[in-house]
Amino acid sequence: MAHLDPADALWRPSNQMGVLNTDLAKQLGAATMGARLWRLAPGQASTRHRHRETTELYVVLEGTGRLRVDDELLTIATHGAVLVEPRSVRQPFNDTGAEQLWLVAGAPPEPANTLAMTAEELAWLYPDGPRALPPELGGGELRRAEGPESEQAV
């Protein structure tokens, strides 16, 4: 068993979008899953991304969540949850006036160090680039993912 006191959790801004998050799974030594808390301030978005193998569970712990999965835009009440399958393009964002706190858990884990990825890996992971904002936050039109590896995406 492992335990993490909230006061001891290490929070940092994400590499791409600067969203404050804490990697619970890493701090607890979990090897077979990933789990993070993400705190989105008004006007912030996480990356629009996809995973090859990871299924992710998105749970809104505080606030009203907004999540785009492929072409579907969802509004998620506090304690609401969405399960997102691999290869689906997803992006949580905050176009409300209040902070949001998300729990995002997934399995199996995939490498998350975007600073060590090749340009090809980054292009697949982020079909609109690593810092694309959703239209609701002033971003451009969303592109559809292309290529043989994205048959189930978008």
Description of each model-found segment:
Residues 1-33, 117-154:
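A short, N-terminal "cap"/entry segment at the start of jelly-roll beta-barrel domains
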Residues 48, 67-68, 84, 90-96, ...:
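Short beta-strand His + acidic residue motifs that chelate non-heme Fe in jelly-roll/DSBH
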Residues 71-87:
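Short acidic-glycine-tyrosine-enriched beta hairpin
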Residues 29-31, 41-44, 64-66, 108-111:
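Short, charged/polar surface micro-motifs in flexible loops or helix N-caps
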Residues 21-23, 36-51:
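Conserved short histidine dyad/triad with adjacent acidic residue
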Residues 44, 53-54, 72, 88-89, ...:
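A generic "binding-loop/recognition-motif" signal
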Residues 53-55, 59-65:
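Glycine- and acidic-residue-biased ligand/ion/polar-headgroup-sensing regions
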Residues 83, 97-114:
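A short hydrophobic beta-strand segment most commonly corresponding to one strand
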